Amino acid sequence: MAICGQGTHLSGMILQPLQPANLTDGSVGVGFSNRVTTVGVNTVVSSILNAGGVFHRNASGALSLAYVADGRLLGYTEKHMNAWDCLAGQLLVAEVGGGSEAQSAEAMIKQGGRVVVGAPGVFDQLIAISDHAYSA
């Protein structure tokens, strides 16, 4: 659970702030759905691997965002998610000091959009990878 300005809680305990990291320090969640082509996700996975990282896919973007907040994943990227799958998870990550790409809640509710979150250090790397991959 997270409340803006009050941290992220798991099983009644407040989660500690995310520590700075690099792509080589763990796994990055990668989301994919049939709403988008495979070109972008192929580029994301290749870019993560080429940077010395490892990717993880569990078919639940919402759960992956919670894993980032808890430090189980270094970050997460997906070209398109619906608001109900991501806005709460983005708050979870932001409340533990992770980076979360700015979103318009209104735009996300109407049409969904790209989601990128990450631990300090990883977030900027994932933004660059996502910009490159999803612009194609």
Which functions belong to the PLM regions below?
Residues 70-75, 95-99:
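Alpha-to-beta junction loops
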Residues 32, 79-81, 103-106:
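Short secondary-structure boundary segments
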